[in-house]
A protein has these predicted regions:
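Tubulin/FtsZ superfamily GTPase core signature
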Residues: 1-195
Length: 195
């Protein structure tokens, strides 16, 4: 889910931001468009993903800590996009957010939560969300259960596209309001002051 958001954001085109994708699943990473991308935890997952285990996602992110630090070192604001309930997003996103915060960046978690019928994923998602909240300045949650209200009777892939569009438009709006001179002048210091 997180890399799908990232790819959608990249394709939308955001002025003033670098779009970075990281994943434990090499195949999925290969099909995502981004300015920069890298595999998390190659030694832990061998590029095959985390199998839904958040501990493995955290371990993979920790293994790639130097690459994460290098990618985020000069960032003023970092949006950490992830799907909660699986392995990589649930376990890895809080580690990435922690690194971003250590650089002094404003950290905004942007996550999707699983459907209630995905019971096994819901508990993991709640745990991951709490961890992410602990290390982020704010977290924006898109609940898949509410997606049904927004997307109506659309097929599931189109409903997810609606969510990705919503997230991408929001991030683009925030970034470009700060980075691109316009009639509405909001600078980074203003944002830092309200976080």
């Amino acid at each position: 889910a997180g890399n799908n958001m990232v790819g959608w954001l990249y394709n939308k085109g955001v002025k003033g931001a670098e779009i970075i994708a990281c994943n434990t699943d090499q195949q999925h990473l290969n099909i995502i468009d981004a300015d920069r991308k890298f595999l998390l935890g190659e030694g832990v997952t061998r590029g095959l993903g985390c199998g839904g285990f958040p501990e493995k996602g955290a371990e993979a992110a920790k293994e790639s800590l130097q690459e994460v630090k290098q990618s985020l070192k000069e960032s003023d604001m970092v949006f950490v996009c992830a799907g909660m309930g699986g392995g990589t997003g649930t376990g890895g996103a809080p580690i990435v957010a922690e690194v971003a915060r250590a650089t002094g960046a404003i950290v905004i978690g942007t996550v999707t939560m699983p459907f209630k019928i995905e019971r096994a994923r819901v508990d993991k998602a709640e745990f991951g969300l709490e961890r992410l909240r602990d290390v982020s300045d704010t977290v924006i949650v898109i609940d898949n259960n509410r997606l049904v209200n927004i997307a109506g009777n659309l097929p599931i892939q189109q409903a997810f596209a609606v969510a990705n569009e919503l997230i991408a438009t929001m991030i683009k709006g925030i970034v470009e309001t700060i980075a691109v001179p316009s009639l509405v002048n909001l600078d980074y210091a203003d944002v830092r002051a309200i976080m």
